[in-house]
Amino acid sequence: MAGNSQRRGAVRKAGTKKGPTVGSGGVRRRGLEGKGATPPAHQRPHHPAGKRAAKAARQAQGRHKKTDDTEIVLGRNPVLECLRAGVPATALYVALGADSDERLTESVQIAADKGIAILEVPRHDLDRIAANGMHQGIALQVPPYNYAHPDDLLAEAKSDAMPALLVALDNISDPRNLGAIVRSVAAFGGHGVLIPQRRSASVTAVAWRTSAGAAARTPVARATNLTRALKQWADAGLQVVGLDADGDTTVDQIDGAGPIVVVVGSEGKGLSRLVRENCDAVVSIPMAGPTESLNASVAAGVVLAEIARQRRSA
């Protein structure tokens, strides 16, 4: 009878009822606020692309310090000259947000066509690579310079329709001087530069930049023994003319119309004794003022300009 039933209803077992759901309290939602747009892959430190970019930047930072290791070419003109000349390269670094111009656009296009890795890196990474900060937002990683042999340099010069015009450097230790001389050799129709294998500046990133890319099209050879190489060139018919502040004659008195090699000594040490003894003539540059000597690269440019003038007049 209703209301008088003694039947017990279903009893829920203890501990089976779910309690209230505990939420995050909005912690995760609030943690996502204010983060902005998702950065590109190469800027995210844990993304594979970001790790590759960071590794490449670290490698580039250290490698430019070693003469015999990979070099870093800096600046838009030198980088473009290297790429145009087909200089082997392993990576092209472009600063994020770098102002674009025709040089940068062409550099990126050539690198892409050649399959060279193109990495966008923060500007401060390039600042670390370039101690002076003069990278213009672009850098090219290239393998060690491939030096020519002195015999090949002479053969290439003699195969040209113009008489051979070569420059040898003695006691030149500043890579900026080397780069500037390479640039002058290219400007005045020279065929190449010869340097000693030891105790001499080499074709580093600094020389590349100073040459404004001329090192890409002007061969540089290394000689184990500079004096012996000059003797061989003399036997091949080249006039060996040394350039020194204590020269026996002046530069305007030499005959630059024929095959010639100009040997440039350093501003401080000049020509070494053995090199000087193997020169057909040692010339100086006449100066009107009280200046005792010119920078080696400036002096080389003056002599090359005089030889070019004589050849135009011949």
Curated annotation (Swiss-Prot):
InterPro entries from the UniProt entry: Alpha/beta_knot_MTases, Ribosomal_eL30-like_sf, rRNA_MeTrfase_TrmH, SpoU_MeTrfase, SpoU_subst-bd, tRNA_m1G_MTases_N
Sites where the protein binds S-adenosyl-L-methionine: G265, I285, L294
Stretches the record annotates as Disordered: 1-70
Biased composition (Basic residues): 43-65
A GO cellular component entry from the record: cytosol
Gene Ontology molecular-function annotations: RNA binding; RNA methyltransferase activity
Enzyme class, first EC level, given as a word: transferase
An individual GO BP term: RNA processing
Database matches in SUPFAM superfamilies: alpha/beta knot, L30e-like
Taxonomy, superkingdom: Bacteria
Intrachain S-S bonds: none
Pfam families: SpoU_methylase, SpoU_sub_bind
Keywords tagged on the record: Methyltransferase, S-adenosyl-L-methionine, Transferase
EC number: 2.1.1.-
PANTHER family: 23S RRNA (GUANOSINE-2'-O-)-METHYLTRANSFERASE RLMB
Family: Belongs to the class IV-like SAM-binding methyltransferase superfamily. RNA methyltransferase TrmH family.
The name this protein goes by in its record: Uncharacterized tRNA/rRNA methyltransferase Mvan_5337
Protein source organism: Mycolicibacterium vanbaalenii (strain DSM 7251 / JCM 13017 / BCRC 16820 / KCTC 9966 / NRRL B-24157 / PYR-1)
